[in-house]
Amino acid sequence: IGNTAIQVAVNPLLATIVPGERMTSYLTVGQIFRNTSLLLLAPIVTGLVAATGSWRLLLPIYAGLTVVGGLWLQLTPVPEPAQRERSAGLADCFRLLKNRAVLLSTLGVACFIAADVGIGFLSVRLIDNPSSILTTTGFYACRIVGTLIGAWVLVKVSDVKYLTWNMTGALALCAALLFVRNEAAIYAAVGVLGFAMACVFATFYAVATKAVPENANEVAGLMIMAISAGAVSGPVCGAIVRAWGNPHLGMLFVAACVAYMLWASIQLKMKN
Protein backbone atom coordinates (compact mmCIF):
# COMPACT_ATOMS: atom_id res chain seq x y z
CA ILE A 1 0.00 0.00 0.00
CA GLY A 2 2.81 2.37 0.89
CA ASN A 3 4.68 1.62 -2.33
CA THR A 4 1.51 2.24 -4.35
CA ALA A 5 0.97 5.60 -2.63
CA ILE A 6 4.51 6.63 -3.57
CA GLN A 7 3.97 5.64 -7.21
CA VAL A 8 0.72 7.60 -7.37
CA ALA A 9 2.48 10.73 -6.09
CA VAL A 10 5.80 10.58 -7.94
CA ASN A 11 4.63 10.26 -11.56
CA PRO A 12 2.41 13.41 -11.57
CA LEU A 13 5.24 15.25 -9.83
CA LEU A 14 7.55 14.30 -12.69
CA ALA A 15 4.96 15.57 -15.17
CA THR A 16 5.21 19.05 -13.65
CA ILE A 17 8.96 19.41 -14.11
CA VAL A 18 9.74 17.86 -17.52
CA PRO A 19 8.70 19.01 -21.03
CA GLY A 20 5.62 17.18 -22.29
CA GLU A 21 7.34 15.95 -25.45
CA ARG A 22 10.07 14.27 -23.37
CA MET A 23 7.91 12.85 -20.62
CA THR A 24 7.93 9.30 -22.01
CA SER A 25 11.73 9.34 -22.14
CA TYR A 26 12.01 10.54 -18.53
CA LEU A 27 9.48 7.97 -17.31
CA THR A 28 11.50 5.31 -19.11
CA VAL A 29 14.60 6.36 -17.17
CA GLY A 30 12.63 5.66 -13.99
CA GLN A 31 11.82 2.19 -15.32
CA ILE A 32 15.57 1.52 -15.62
CA PHE A 33 15.90 1.66 -11.83
CA ARG A 34 12.76 -0.43 -11.33
CA ASN A 35 13.93 -3.15 -13.70
CA THR A 36 17.41 -3.14 -12.17
CA SER A 37 15.82 -3.66 -8.75
CA LEU A 38 13.77 -6.59 -10.05
CA LEU A 39 16.88 -8.13 -11.58
CA LEU A 40 18.86 -7.78 -8.34
CA LEU A 41 16.04 -8.94 -6.05
CA ALA A 42 16.73 -12.69 -6.40
CA PRO A 43 20.49 -12.54 -5.66
CA ILE A 44 19.92 -10.11 -2.77
CA VAL A 45 17.29 -12.36 -1.18
CA THR A 46 19.50 -15.42 -1.76
CA GLY A 47 22.45 -13.64 -0.11
CA LEU A 48 20.35 -12.57 2.87
CA VAL A 49 19.04 -16.10 3.37
CA ALA A 50 22.57 -17.52 3.14
CA ALA A 51 23.95 -14.95 5.60
CA THR A 52 21.11 -14.68 8.12
CA GLY A 53 18.83 -17.65 7.45
CA SER A 54 15.88 -15.36 6.72
CA TRP A 55 14.70 -13.14 3.88
CA ARG A 56 12.90 -10.82 6.34
CA LEU A 57 15.94 -8.56 6.65
CA LEU A 58 14.95 -7.30 3.20
CA LEU A 59 12.01 -5.42 4.77
CA PRO A 60 14.02 -3.00 6.97
CA ILE A 61 16.46 -2.48 4.07
CA TYR A 62 13.53 -1.58 1.82
CA ALA A 63 12.07 0.69 4.52
CA GLY A 64 15.42 2.44 4.98
CA LEU A 65 15.80 3.08 1.25
CA THR A 66 12.25 4.44 1.10
CA VAL A 67 12.90 6.85 3.99
CA VAL A 68 16.16 8.05 2.40
CA GLY A 69 14.40 8.63 -0.92
CA GLY A 70 11.56 10.49 0.80
CA LEU A 71 13.94 12.77 2.72
CA TRP A 72 15.94 13.46 -0.44
CA LEU A 73 12.77 14.45 -2.29
CA GLN A 74 11.56 16.55 0.65
CA LEU A 75 14.82 18.53 0.64
CA THR A 76 14.72 19.04 -3.15
CA PRO A 77 12.92 22.23 -4.25
CA VAL A 78 10.24 21.29 -6.80
CA PRO A 79 8.01 24.01 -8.37
CA GLU A 80 4.56 22.46 -8.01
CA PRO A 81 1.42 23.94 -9.62
CA ALA A 82 -1.15 25.66 -7.43
CA GLN A 83 -3.49 23.23 -5.68
CA ARG A 84 -7.15 23.14 -6.66
CA GLU A 85 -9.81 24.08 -4.15
CA ARG A 86 -11.32 20.58 -4.18
CA SER A 87 -9.28 17.39 -3.95
CA ALA A 88 -9.74 14.78 -6.66
CA GLY A 89 -11.90 11.79 -5.78
CA LEU A 90 -12.48 8.33 -7.19
CA ALA A 91 -15.35 9.59 -9.35
CA ASP A 92 -13.04 12.20 -10.89
CA CYS A 93 -10.60 9.45 -11.87
CA PHE A 94 -13.24 7.30 -13.56
CA ARG A 95 -14.76 10.34 -15.29
CA LEU A 96 -11.53 10.70 -17.27
CA LEU A 97 -12.26 7.39 -18.99
CA LYS A 98 -14.65 9.33 -21.24
CA ASN A 99 -11.49 10.57 -22.95
CA ARG A 100 -10.62 7.94 -25.57
CA ALA A 101 -6.84 8.36 -25.18
CA VAL A 102 -7.09 7.93 -21.41
CA LEU A 103 -9.34 4.86 -21.76
CA LEU A 104 -7.06 3.19 -24.32
CA SER A 105 -3.99 3.95 -22.21
CA THR A 106 -5.51 2.73 -18.94
CA LEU A 107 -6.56 -0.57 -20.50
CA GLY A 108 -3.12 -0.70 -22.12
CA VAL A 109 -1.42 -0.49 -18.73
CA ALA A 110 -3.75 -3.19 -17.39
CA CYS A 111 -2.83 -5.48 -20.30
CA PHE A 112 0.87 -4.66 -19.92
CA ILE A 113 0.91 -5.62 -16.23
CA ALA A 114 -1.14 -8.76 -16.93
CA ALA A 115 1.27 -9.76 -19.71
CA ASP A 116 4.32 -8.90 -17.60
CA VAL A 117 3.16 -11.07 -14.69
CA GLY A 118 2.10 -13.79 -17.11
CA ILE A 119 5.55 -13.91 -18.69
CA GLY A 120 7.14 -14.13 -15.24
CA PHE A 121 4.79 -17.00 -14.35
CA LEU A 122 5.33 -18.91 -17.59
CA SER A 123 9.00 -18.27 -18.34
CA VAL A 124 10.26 -20.69 -15.66
CA ARG A 125 7.82 -23.34 -16.93
CA LEU A 126 8.72 -23.16 -20.61
CA ILE A 127 11.97 -25.03 -19.93
CA ASP A 128 11.99 -28.28 -17.93
CA ASN A 129 15.41 -27.59 -16.45
CA PRO A 130 16.73 -26.36 -13.06
CA SER A 131 18.33 -23.42 -14.89
CA SER A 132 14.91 -22.27 -16.17
CA ILE A 133 15.02 -19.45 -13.58
CA LEU A 134 17.53 -17.83 -15.94
CA THR A 135 14.70 -17.08 -18.37
CA THR A 136 13.21 -14.65 -15.83
CA THR A 137 16.64 -13.16 -15.15
CA GLY A 138 17.22 -12.74 -18.88
CA PHE A 139 13.79 -11.16 -19.30
CA TYR A 140 14.53 -8.41 -16.77
CA ALA A 141 18.12 -7.98 -17.95
CA CYS A 142 16.84 -7.32 -21.46
CA ARG A 143 14.19 -5.01 -20.02
CA ILE A 144 17.02 -2.90 -18.60
CA VAL A 145 18.71 -2.78 -22.01
CA GLY A 146 15.36 -1.89 -23.56
CA THR A 147 14.78 1.00 -21.16
CA LEU A 148 18.31 2.34 -21.70
CA ILE A 149 17.90 2.30 -25.48
CA GLY A 150 14.28 3.45 -25.25
CA ALA A 151 15.16 6.50 -23.15
CA TRP A 152 17.46 7.61 -25.99
CA VAL A 153 15.20 6.63 -28.90
CA LEU A 154 12.11 8.30 -27.42
CA VAL A 155 13.84 11.67 -27.53
CA LYS A 156 13.95 11.34 -31.33
CA VAL A 157 10.96 9.12 -32.24
CA SER A 158 7.24 9.40 -31.50
CA ASP A 159 6.43 7.38 -28.38
CA VAL A 160 3.28 5.85 -29.90
CA LYS A 161 5.13 4.87 -33.09
CA TYR A 162 7.89 3.23 -31.02
CA LEU A 163 5.23 1.38 -29.03
CA THR A 164 3.68 0.06 -32.25
CA TRP A 165 7.05 -1.24 -33.46
CA ASN A 166 7.72 -2.99 -30.15
CA MET A 167 4.26 -4.54 -29.83
CA THR A 168 4.44 -5.88 -33.39
CA GLY A 169 7.67 -7.66 -32.50
CA ALA A 170 6.31 -8.79 -29.12
CA LEU A 171 3.24 -10.38 -30.73
CA ALA A 172 5.46 -12.29 -33.17
CA LEU A 173 7.59 -13.53 -30.25
CA CYS A 174 4.51 -14.68 -28.31
CA ALA A 175 3.41 -16.65 -31.38
CA ALA A 176 6.89 -18.18 -31.68
CA LEU A 177 6.90 -19.25 -28.02
CA LEU A 178 3.74 -21.28 -28.64
CA PHE A 179 5.75 -23.64 -30.85
CA VAL A 180 9.46 -23.29 -30.03
CA ARG A 181 10.92 -26.06 -27.84
CA ASN A 182 14.67 -25.46 -28.22
CA GLU A 183 16.09 -24.12 -24.92
CA ALA A 184 18.43 -21.57 -26.50
CA ALA A 185 15.62 -20.26 -28.72
CA ILE A 186 13.30 -19.92 -25.70
CA TYR A 187 15.94 -18.00 -23.73
CA ALA A 188 16.48 -15.69 -26.71
CA ALA A 189 12.76 -15.16 -27.38
CA VAL A 190 11.94 -14.38 -23.74
CA GLY A 191 14.89 -11.97 -23.58
CA VAL A 192 13.89 -10.08 -26.73
CA LEU A 193 10.31 -10.04 -25.44
CA GLY A 194 11.61 -8.29 -22.33
CA PHE A 195 13.32 -5.72 -24.56
CA ALA A 196 10.08 -5.10 -26.48
CA MET A 197 8.08 -4.61 -23.25
CA ALA A 198 10.54 -2.13 -21.74
CA CYS A 199 8.84 1.18 -22.59
CA VAL A 200 5.16 0.21 -22.58
CA PHE A 201 4.12 1.58 -19.18
CA ALA A 202 5.95 4.87 -19.71
CA THR A 203 4.35 5.36 -23.12
CA PHE A 204 0.76 4.70 -22.06
CA TYR A 205 1.18 6.82 -18.93
CA ALA A 206 2.67 9.74 -20.87
CA VAL A 207 -0.02 9.58 -23.58
CA ALA A 208 -2.81 9.68 -20.97
CA THR A 209 -1.17 12.52 -19.03
CA LYS A 210 -0.61 14.60 -22.17
CA ALA A 211 -4.27 14.08 -23.14
CA VAL A 212 -5.48 15.70 -19.89
CA PRO A 213 -2.46 17.52 -18.38
CA GLU A 214 -4.63 19.37 -15.89
CA ASN A 215 -5.68 16.03 -14.37
CA ALA A 216 -2.26 14.42 -13.90
CA ASN A 217 -3.11 13.25 -10.36
CA GLU A 218 -6.28 11.50 -11.49
CA VAL A 219 -4.43 9.84 -14.39
CA ALA A 220 -1.85 8.52 -11.92
CA GLY A 221 -4.64 7.06 -9.81
CA LEU A 222 -6.17 5.31 -12.83
CA MET A 223 -2.84 3.86 -13.89
CA ILE A 224 -2.06 2.49 -10.45
CA MET A 225 -5.54 0.95 -10.26
CA ALA A 226 -4.87 -0.69 -13.63
CA ILE A 227 -1.84 -2.43 -12.14
CA SER A 228 -4.22 -4.66 -10.18
CA ALA A 229 -4.87 -6.49 -13.47
CA GLY A 230 -1.68 -8.41 -12.76
CA ALA A 231 -3.60 -10.38 -10.13
CA VAL A 232 -5.51 -12.31 -12.81
CA SER A 233 -2.44 -13.49 -14.75
CA GLY A 234 -1.32 -16.28 -12.44
CA PRO A 235 -4.76 -17.92 -12.08
CA VAL A 236 -5.58 -17.59 -15.80
CA CYS A 237 -2.21 -18.88 -17.03
CA GLY A 238 -2.27 -21.62 -14.39
CA ALA A 239 -5.75 -22.71 -15.48
CA ILE A 240 -4.63 -22.88 -19.13
CA VAL A 241 -1.54 -24.92 -18.23
CA ARG A 242 -3.55 -27.33 -16.06
CA ALA A 243 -6.30 -27.73 -18.64
CA TRP A 244 -3.99 -28.61 -21.54
CA GLY A 245 -0.88 -29.71 -19.67
CA ASN A 246 1.27 -27.46 -21.86
CA PRO A 247 2.90 -24.30 -20.43
CA HIS A 248 3.51 -22.97 -23.95
CA LEU A 249 -0.25 -22.58 -24.45
CA GLY A 250 -0.26 -20.12 -21.55
CA MET A 251 1.37 -17.70 -24.00
CA LEU A 252 -2.07 -17.36 -25.61
CA PHE A 253 -3.08 -15.18 -22.67
CA VAL A 254 0.07 -13.06 -23.01
CA ALA A 255 -0.47 -12.83 -26.77
CA ALA A 256 -4.03 -11.56 -26.24
CA CYS A 257 -2.73 -8.81 -23.94
CA VAL A 258 0.00 -7.85 -26.43
CA ALA A 259 -2.53 -7.86 -29.29
CA TYR A 260 -4.65 -5.32 -27.43
CA MET A 261 -1.60 -3.12 -26.79
CA LEU A 262 -0.71 -3.25 -30.49
CA TRP A 263 -4.28 -2.32 -31.45
CA ALA A 264 -4.35 0.50 -28.87
CA SER A 265 -1.05 1.91 -30.14
CA ILE A 266 -2.43 1.99 -33.70
CA GLN A 267 -5.60 3.74 -32.49
CA LEU A 268 -3.58 6.30 -30.55
CA LYS A 269 -1.32 6.91 -33.56
CA MET A 270 -4.39 7.54 -35.74
CA LYS A 271 -5.80 9.89 -33.09
CA ASN A 272 -2.53 11.85 -32.93
Identify the role of each PLM range.
Residues 1-32:
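Cytoplasmic helix-loop-helix junction between adjacent transmembrane helices
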Residues 70-77, 252-272:
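Multi-pass alpha-helical transporter architecture, strongest
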